[in-house]
UniProtKB/Swiss-Prot annotation:
GO molecular function: 2 iron, 2 sulfur cluster binding; 4 iron, 4 sulfur cluster binding; biotin synthase activity; metal ion binding
Cofactor annotation: [4Fe-4S] cluster; [2Fe-2S] cluster
HAMAP family, sorted: BioB
Catalytic reaction equation(s): (4R,5S)-dethiobiotin + (sulfur carrier)-SH + 2 reduced [2Fe-2S]-[ferredoxin] + 2 S-adenosyl-L-methionine = (sulfur carrier)-H + biotin + 2 5'-deoxyadenosine + 2 L-methionine + 2 oxidized [2Fe-2S]-[ferredoxin]
Region (Disordered) residue spans: 366-393
Full protein name: Biotin synthase, mitochondrial
Annotated positions binding [4Fe-4S] cluster: 96, 100, 103
Gene name of this polypeptide: bioB
Organism name: Emericella nidulans (strain FGSC A4 / ATCC 38163 / CBS 112.46 / NRRL 194 / M139)
GO CC term (a single one): mitochondrion
Coiled-coil ranges (or none): none
SUPFAM superfamilies in the cross-refs: Radical SAM enzymes
Length: 393
């Protein structure tokens, strides 16, 4: 006996699953994509002449289209399965004279953090060995102070740390506040891979967060680092109370530097009790993802690094960021003064989703330029017409 289930439902609710609608044409898709995004997806090399309006066009693209475009750009310039594992150590904690509203290490706020002297060189190198043994390929060191003026002994110790980490075959990055041209050269000669100095936010919003160091002073330090031949690492913090326009402004400023930074850290504010921003809520995930995707598109060859606040994201949210172009994380025991995802946790996540750790210096030693990678993709497409084009939207 046959049974007809459709008779029990009103005719209006019966769906014709066999109906095939006409597919939208490529032109109809393109008409909904901002011109700036179309140009970015087709690009074969980074450009440093983005206008703020163009960055805004990209940032305001509907999120599903934006992340899809970011994934296409990511595959054009990077291995989409490779994630750089970095470990950050505080080599000098607390006692900083600056008034950064988000920072637990400022001496102006009562956060319960005890100031320390600089860690001994041997202790730092041992931490680097542990990080390497656990899979990290970049070791970063941070010191809580305004600048390096009058710190000759400290600079000497930092240079020993840099040389020691490089001898292990690891990349090494430091963040020491403002430095001058001579100090940058000394660090370069010691073997420094990268120098971190975040812009934090847009020029317009910056004075509401920090008053003891100007935006131009930050840009000057980046200039010294770049002129010394050291890779620039510079990004921002999300959730400071900024508007979308400030996230757009940050990315525009970084993209307008003489050359794009080697890495762009995306930090989500971790509210610290006792600081002026201690009662802030974490930024919504859609805005964080939108920032990651925009950074990937506007800074196509740059490493986009998930930094502070990643521990608050679910595994699925982290993977969404990776698929939208993030390709580095901080991992290990701590990230300066805040909690951090651990090595075992991250390796297990990579295994579940098909990612793997980027090798040390992989970005530098890979002989293929972005254009050569594009040519390779095109060649594979000719051999296999079914393969999707990297830039297709």
């Amino acid at each position: 006996m046959s049974v007809s289930f459709t008779r029990s439902f009103p005719r209006a609710f019966i769906r014709s699953y066999g109906t095939v609608q006409s597919s939208p044409t490529a032109a109809s898709f393109a008409s909904r994509i901002p011109p700036a995004l179309q140009e970015a997806v087709a690009a074969t090399a980074p450009r440093t002449n983005w206008t703020r309006d163009e960055v805004q066009q990209i940032y305001e693209t509907p999120l599903n289209q934006l992340t899809y475009a970011a994934a296409a750009v990511h595959r054009r310039f990077h291995d989409p399965s490779a994630i750089q594992m970095c470990t950050l150590m505080n080599i000098k904690t607390g006692g900083c004279s600056e008034d950064c509203s988000y920072c637990a290490q400022s001496s102006r706020y009562s956060t319960g953090l005890k100031a320390t002297k600089m860690s001994p060189v041997d202790d730092v190198l041992e931490k680097a060995r542990i990080a390497k043994a656990n899979g990290s390929t970049r070791f970063c060191m941070g010191a809580a102070w305004r600048d390096m003026r009058g710190r000759k002994t400290s600079l000497k110790n930092v240079k020993q740390m840099v040389s020691g980490v490089r001898e292990m075959g690891m990349e090494v990055c430091v963040t020491l506040g403002m430095i001058d041209a001579d100090q940058a050269k000394e660090l370069k000669d010691a073997g420094l891979t990268a120098y971190n100095h975040n812009l934090d936010t847009s020029r317009e919003f910056y004075p509401t967060i920090i008053t003891t160091r100007s935006y131009d002073e930050r840009l000057k330090t980046l200039s010294h680092v770049r002129d010394a031949g050291i890779n620039v690492c510079s990004g921002g913090i999300l959730g400071l109370g900024e508007a979308d326009s400030d996230r757009i402004g940050l990315i525009h400023t970084v993209s307008s530097l003489p050359s794009h930074p080697e890495s762009f850290p995306v930090n989500a504010l971790v509210p610290i009790k006792g600081t002026p921003l201690g009662d802030r809520k974490m930024i919504s995930f859609d805005k964080l993802l939108r920032t990651v995707a925009t950074a990937r598109i506007v800074l196509p060859a740059t490493i986009v690094r998930l930094a502070a606040g990643r521990i608050s994201l679910t595994e699925e949210q982290q993977v969404a960021c990776f698929m939208a172009g993030a390709n580095a994380v901080f991992t290990g025991e701590k990230m300066l003064t805040t909690d951090c995802n651990g090595w075992d946790e991250d390796r297990a996540m990579f295994d579940r989703w098909g990612f793997y750790p980027m090798r040390s210096f992989e970005k530098e030693t890979n002989a293929a330029t972005p254009q050569q990678h594009v040519d390779s993709v095109a060649h594979e497409s000719e051999k296999n017409p079914a393969a999707p084009a990297a830039e297709a939207l």
